[in-house]
C-alpha cells in the first residue's frame, strides 16, 4: 500500500507540470556582447550616413526581472563629403536601468524598456584636421555626454545563454556632429552566476 501511494505521488508530480529553471533572480549577473547598425543599414557606400556599433555590457538583475546595466560601446557613423565620407566615432561608457514590462511564466522571453546615462569621447576623421582635398575641419574631437532610451528583448536558449535584440535612441551633447543616433542590433548574453 505504501509503495503504491509513493508511485502515485511520483506519477502525479511528473505529469502535473514541468519545472522551469529559475531565471532573472536578484543578484544574478550576465555578460552581453552586442553588435548592430546605427542610423540606418550600413552598406559601405561613401554616400551613406549609416554606421555600425559594438558593445560589451554587464547586467545585474533585481526583483521582478528588472536589471541594472553597465557597459561600453563603440559606434561609428559616416558623414558624406564630396566623393568620400568622414568617419565619426563615439566611444562611450554607460549605466542604466531596464524595467521588465512583459514576460512569459517560465521567463524564457522577456521584454524591457530602459534608460541610461552615458559619457565618452567623439572623434571626427580620426583627429586629422585636413581633408584629402585640403579643406580643414573645425572640430576633430570632443567629450560627449547624454543618455539613451531603449526597447530590448531577451530570449533564453538555455539557462546560461540568451539571444538579445534591441532598439536604442542615443542623445548626446558636447559635439557638433549631431545629437541623435538610432541603433538596432542583436547580441548574446552569458549568465555568469
What are the residue ranges of the model-derived segments?
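Cleavable N-terminal export/targeting peptides
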Residues: 1-28, 193
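Residues that define the transmembrane beta-barrel architecture of outer-membrane proteins
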Residues: 27-31, 48-54, 85-93, 109, ...
